[in-house]
């Protein structure tokens, strides 16, 4: 029997089924760099507006992990999506270069080398070199992810111009009257010997002592109440602060019960305390808290006086209703202390050890000098003697330093703060507080997910003043001079601008290198003898908060692009970068520095647990890239609900690889089957069949859906729509039905050429939607298809744009045939019956069948194509009968070329195939 395989249109494509991504992607990216692809994205002429995504800076320390990849890939997808929509895009990657982690790395290095480095400039030089090293490492690792941006000129917070911009932002804060030096309690990390901002504190579970202590009322107070004996009972989980107690706060207007044994507690808590065994049950007297104000008790630890005061923060839900008050160790205590003019005792040094003030102030005996506060607690509790009514251990949520993961303490020190509740002049001349301006600004920002708005609002409503100063070396200095004559900072414009210019020219190391005279402008140098330098550095959150100013307003390539269209970071940045940027934007410009905030979750293992080296559940980014390639990692990011935590395991990436293969193989099939198209046919109109119209209408519908959800940055929903279309309507229905025409019709067949145009349009749409995600792969698709490039008028992926299907195909509308749903129902029932017949050995495939359909209104050609039967009608040999159709053995012979049972003679081509063979001669 003659072979006809070579007469079929079994077209091929050079686009490989195997992507070999880890080998090919670096070559593609190198080509993009050589061709300056991102500059094309920035400088496109046919644009429809601008789009700026401002990059929240990662820290220039260590290698990238999967969390970094998630963040940067999402940003890249968002930026590319806007580019392919027709916009000029701006994305300058940046790095946060100052701060404690780098200092710690250098200190550890010096310790290993058994050397010390007292010279601050040399120490800062080592820090700078460390940041440079890891900045380059991370930059190259980002490039491996297929991320495009202005990597030739990224922003770095340690660049001289950038340091000057940060300092100028600080100067503006000072000039608006919002920067003040104050002595108040702040979060203090004894592990790194520095103040911490609220954003640098994380909460973890900690075991602490829980003690109830009796403070006996003094004789004069007892006489005032006309009682012989009474002790206020306080509850605390920080026994180490008892030596700094100066007051006991009660709840205003609340009732307090005196027990028979002389213990005074809130009546509302009496029964709870009896159950705990803290106090006895019999109540002998009741007092209103207001009548107890200004009584005096005795601290049993050091016999110092403790004033009875009233406080709004006192709870009647737990404790005793009598709150131990030490203004040096708590925010509420401090503010209440201001009201009552209480002494602020601070007997703890920067290392968390008791200092000499315990002796001078007679707070503790000298045996505690130099002892760490947490170590001293056991002795303190022993020293309380009978005044310690109950000692327990509790596990509770406690603030920890986010860098060292050690507990932090509240410690009153002199620091610099940005004031949240100090009115300052707005652009319209009115006066509002920073808190008010920030809360108003939030209302004008779009949040994805929307819950982010309320989360940020609550944080702004409740946050304290922003502690800016740090007692470290590697950072931008709080470069102010204190006038020793007035003890006030010098905020003269000439002095401040001179310092900023020095920083811009020589870097802010000069603050440590130069004498005061050399830091002053010539006209002010006579005052040098009256000045002293502030030697604190700035909170690194102020560095990163000011990035919008440097990048979008001052000197960078994106100048004039503030506020940015989008910022996109992890959900923890509501308390970090989003918040600090918002506050600084509201100070400098009376508005948020961004229009939209998008947040993503965190990377966790397949059980939902946080990844850590100790657990052995870390998935290596480097290994993933080597095994799967960056486009698979990018598809994994996009195919997940990134707004929640993302679970990771090798299994998830294997599943993603299957999704990738489905898209790739579909594109390969499409490319192969329109590869023989005559380019002259691309612009003319075609006669599209009802089946073509079905697919085109479906394509239009899903395109609108995908555009809509992609606009909301819901990439997983969009990809699921695309995958369902590719699997069901495209592969499962249309391509199955069209293979006969594609393979067996004449190349000049109008029907086949119309199908090819449909495939071309589908490929165009898939490339457009997938390009922001699978950029390497879509570049490869275009490299291997002259026809697709000609159709799209694109030489590479960066020329891609969306197409109007109707315009491209010269159609007024795409409308699927009437009764098409009935056809699909018939197809489903037919396939079910066909499976039964195959199992019973009656037929081997659908082509052996002829079908007679009860619903006569159904188009015969469509029935034949969709069901892939050889003909529609009746025949002699009935093989099956159902309520909706009857199946017969096809009455003709099998065509040896197309395999349909349409030949009149055995081993002879059918009429259609004879005509095609004749044309091929």
From Swiss-Prot:
Gene3D superfamilies: 1.10.730.20, HUPs (3.40.50.620), Ile-tRNA synthetase CP2 domain-like (1.10.10.830). GO terms for cellular component: cytosol. One of its GO terms (molecular function) is aminoacyl-tRNA deacylase activity. L-isoleucyl-5'-AMP binds at residue 569. Binds 1 zinc ion per subunit. GO terms for biological process: isoleucyl-tRNA aminoacylation. Keywords: Aminoacyl-tRNA synthetase, ATP-binding, Cytoplasm, Ligase, Metal-binding, Nucleotide-binding, Protein biosynthesis, Zinc. A motif ('KMSKS' region) lies at residues 610-614. It catalyses: tRNA(Ile) + L-isoleucine + ATP = L-isoleucyl-tRNA(Ile) + AMP + diphosphate. It holds the Pfam family tRNA-synt_1. Zn(2+) binds at residues 895, 898, 910, 913. Belongs to the class-I aminoacyl-tRNA synthetase family. IleS type 1 subfamily. Monomer. IleRS has two distinct active sites: one for aminoacylation and one for editing. The misactivated valine is translocated from the active site to the editing site, which sterically excludes the correctly activated isoleucine. The single editing site contains two valyl binding pockets, one specific for each substrate (Val-AMP or Val-tRNA(Ile)). This is Isoleucine--tRNA ligase. It comes from Helicobacter acinonychis (strain Sheeba).
């Amino acid at each position: 029997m003659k072979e006809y395989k070579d007469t079929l249109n079994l077209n091929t494509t050079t686009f490989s089924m195997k992507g070999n991504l880890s080998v090919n992607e670096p070559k593609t990216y190198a080509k993009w760099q050589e061709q300056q692809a991102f500059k094309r994205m920035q400088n496109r002429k046919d644009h429809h507006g601008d789009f700026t995504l401002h990059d929240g800076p990662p820290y220039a320390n260590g290698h990238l992990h999967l969390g970094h990849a998630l963040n940067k890939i999402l940003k890249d997808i968002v930026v590319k999506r806007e580019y392919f929509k027709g916009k000029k895009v701006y994305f300058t990657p940046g790095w946060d270069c100052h701060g404690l982690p780098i200092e710690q790395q250098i200190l550890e290095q010096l310790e290993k080398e058994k050397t010390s480095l007292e010279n601050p400039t040399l120490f800062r030089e080592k820090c700078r070199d460390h940041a440079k090293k890891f900045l380059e490492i991370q930059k190259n690792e980002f490039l491996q992810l297929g991320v495009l941006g202005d990597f030739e000129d990224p922003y770095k917070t340690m660049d001289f111009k950038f340091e000057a911009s940060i300092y100028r932002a600080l100067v503006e804060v000072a000039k608006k009257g919002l920067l003040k030096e104050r002595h108040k309690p702040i979060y203090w990390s004894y592990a790194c010997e520095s103040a911490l901002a609220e954003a640098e504190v994380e909460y973890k579970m900690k075991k602490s002592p829980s003690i109830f202590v009796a403070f006996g009322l003094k004789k004069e107070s007892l006489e005032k109440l006309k009682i012989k004996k009474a002790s206020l009972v306080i509850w605390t989980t920080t026994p180490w602060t008892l030596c700094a107690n100066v007051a006991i706060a009660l709840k205003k207007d609340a009732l307090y019960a005196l027990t028979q044994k002389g213990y005074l507690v809130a009546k509302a808590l009496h029964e709870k305390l009896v159950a705990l065994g803290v106090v006895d049950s019999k109540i002998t007297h009741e007092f209103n808290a207001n009548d107890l104000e200004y009584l005096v008790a005795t601290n049993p630890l050091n016999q110092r006086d403790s004033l009875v005061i009233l406080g709004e923060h006192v709870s009647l839900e737990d404790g005793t209703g009598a709150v131990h008050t030490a203004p040096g160790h708590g925010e509420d205590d401090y503010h209440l202390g201001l009201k009552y003019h209480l002494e602020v005792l601070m007997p703890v040094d920067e290392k968390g050890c008791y200092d000499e003030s315990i002796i001078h102030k007679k707070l503790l005996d000298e045996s505690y000098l130099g002892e760490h506060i947490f170590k001293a607690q056991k002795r303190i509790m022993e020293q309380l003697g009978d005044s310690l009514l109950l000692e327990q251990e509790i596990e509770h949520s406690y603030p920890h330093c986010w860098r060292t993961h050690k507990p932090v303490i509240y410690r009153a020190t002199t620091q610099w703060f940005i004031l949240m509740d100090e009115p300052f002049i707005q652009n319209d001349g009115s006066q509002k507080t920073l808190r008010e301006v920030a809360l108003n600004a939030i209302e004008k920002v779009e949040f994805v997910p929307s819950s982010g708005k309320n989360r940020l609002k609550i944080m702004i409503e409740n946050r304290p003043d922003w502690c800016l100063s740090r007692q470290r070396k590697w950072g931008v200095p709080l470069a102010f001079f204190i006038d020793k004559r007035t003890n006030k900072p010098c905020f003269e414009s000439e002095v401040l601008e001179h310092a900023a210019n020095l920083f811009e020219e020589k870097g802010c190391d000069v603050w440590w290198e130069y004498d005061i005279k050399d830091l002053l402008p010539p006209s002010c140098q006579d005052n040098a003898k009256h000045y002293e330098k502030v030697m604190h550095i700035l909170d690194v959150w102020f560095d990163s908060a000011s990035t919008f100013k440097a990048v979008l307003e001052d000197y960078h390539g994106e100048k004039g692009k503030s506020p940015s269209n989008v910022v996109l970071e992890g959900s923890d940045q509501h308390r970090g970068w989003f918040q600090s940027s918002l506050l600084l934007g509201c100070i400098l410009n009376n508005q948020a520095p961004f229009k939209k905030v998008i947040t993503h979750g965190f990377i966790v293992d397949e059980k939902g647990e946080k990844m850590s080296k100790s657990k052995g559940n870390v998935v290596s980014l480097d290994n993933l890239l080597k095994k799967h390639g960056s486009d698979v990692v990018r598809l994994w990011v996009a195919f997940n609900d990134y707004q929640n935590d993302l679970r990771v395991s090798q299994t998830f990436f294997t599943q993603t690889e299957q999704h990738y293969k489905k898209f790739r193989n579909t594109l390969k099939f499409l490319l192969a089957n329109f590869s023989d198209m005559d380019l002259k046919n691309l612009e003319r109109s075609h006669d599209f069949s009802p089946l073509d119209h079905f697919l085109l209408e479906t394509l239009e519908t899903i395109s609108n859906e995908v555009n809509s959800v992609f606009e909301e940055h819901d990439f997983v929903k969009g990809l699921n729509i695309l995958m369902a279309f590719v699997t069901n309507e495209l592969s499962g229905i249309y391509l199955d039905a069209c293979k006969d025409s594609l393979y067996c019709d004449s190349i000049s067949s109008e029907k086949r050429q119309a199908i090819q145009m449909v495939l071309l349009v589908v490929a165009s749409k898939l490339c457009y939607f997938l390009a922001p995600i699978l950029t390497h792969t879509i570049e490869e698709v275009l490299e291997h298809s002259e026809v697709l490039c000609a159709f799209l008028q694109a030489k590479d992926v960066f020329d891609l744009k969306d197409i109007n299907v109707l315009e491209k195909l010269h159609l007024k509308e795409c409308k699927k045939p009437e009764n098409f749903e009935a056809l699909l129902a018939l197809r489903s029932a037919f396939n079910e019956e066909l499976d039964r017949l195959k199992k019973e050995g009656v037929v081997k495939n659908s082509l052996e069948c002829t079908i007679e359909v009860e619903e006569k209104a159904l188009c015969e050609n469509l029935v034949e194509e969709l069901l892939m039967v050889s003909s529609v009608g009746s025949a002699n040999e009935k093989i099956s009968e159902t309520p909706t159709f009857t199946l017969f053995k096809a009455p003709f012979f099998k065509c040896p070329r197309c395999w349909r049972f349409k030949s009149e003679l055995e081993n002879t081509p059918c009429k259609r195939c004879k005509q095609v063979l004749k044309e091929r001669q």
